[in-house]
Amino acid sequence: MKDMKMQSSPETMMTRIPTPDPHSTGVREDAMDSVCKPWKLYENPYYCSSQSQQHQHQRKAFIWDLNFIKVFMESELGKAQDEIKELKAELDYERKARRRAELMIKKLAKDVEEERMAREAEEMQNKRLFKELSSEKSEMVRMKRDLEEERQMHRLAEVLREERVQMKLMDARLFLEEKLSELEEANRQGERERNRMMKPKILERACSSPARRRCENPQIKRGINPFPRVMRAIRSKSEKWGSKLECQKVQLKILLRQKTTPRCTPLLSSPPP
């Protein structure tokens, strides 16, 4: 773009060349005369040679070239000034953009710092929670182990309690069997005593039966009781012992069926009959 401007600028400058000012050209010619005086063979003021004329033509061409170069340089200076203005505007825009970018970078850095601090706080929180979780897990493992030990102890206690109950039941059974055997032995002895005591009475009744038949009332023969009496029912000791024996047998069966300790305590504490 700049090359095109540079190529088109001389043509535009040729079209824009102004007419030279005679006063300014005269001043320039006097300056050139004072600077470049031709050498004269004689100090003749009317001396004029062809070289001086040629020199004057060269001087005019030089002045023309200077005017052309001045216009060209002025146009180039205007372009340069415009470019400088554009560059200044771009520089200002770049500075503003850089300031905005710096502000944005500062803001992002602040956000990043906040995010980093938040992440560090979260990591510390996660570490603390992980430590608490690990401690809770270890506590749970310990509690499970203690619970398992307590369960084993309870099982062992149950087994020991069951064995103790079985032993107590066995002792109660042996005690009741012993008592039952004692009761049976006492029952047999009572039967023997009763039989031994009943034999003389039977003999006496057998001996006194003929005499009693002789003096028997005829009403009794006919089935009439002249003196009715109410006789009290007398139970023998053997019947009493038999009923107690049956009751204790029933209690023993209930005790062996239920197999509970509270049931056997009153039996063990009760005195033998």
UniProtKB/Swiss-Prot annotation:
The membrane spanning regions, by residue number, are none
Q: Please summarize what the entry says happens upon disruption of the gene.
A: Shows trichomes with no branching.
Region Disordered, as annotated, extends over 1-30
The protein's matches in InterPro entries, at most eight in alphabetical order, are given as:
BLT-like
Which UniProt keywords are present, listed alphabetically?
Answer: Coiled coil
Instruction: Please give the coiled-coil regions recorded for this protein.
Output: 69-199
Enumerate the Gene Ontology biological process terms: trichome branching; trichome morphogenesis
Compositionally biased, Polar residues: which spans?
1-12
Give the highest taxon in the source lineage.
Eukaryota
Q: Note the subunit structure.
A: Interacts with STI.
Against PANTHER family, the record matches this protein to: GB|AAF24581.1, PROTEIN BRANCHLESS TRICHOME
Q: What does this protein do?
A: Acts as a key regulator of trichome branching. Could participate with STI in the same pathway. Also plays a role in integrating endoreplication levels with cell shape.
Protein name (database record): Protein BRANCHLESS TRICHOME
Tell me the gene name: BLT
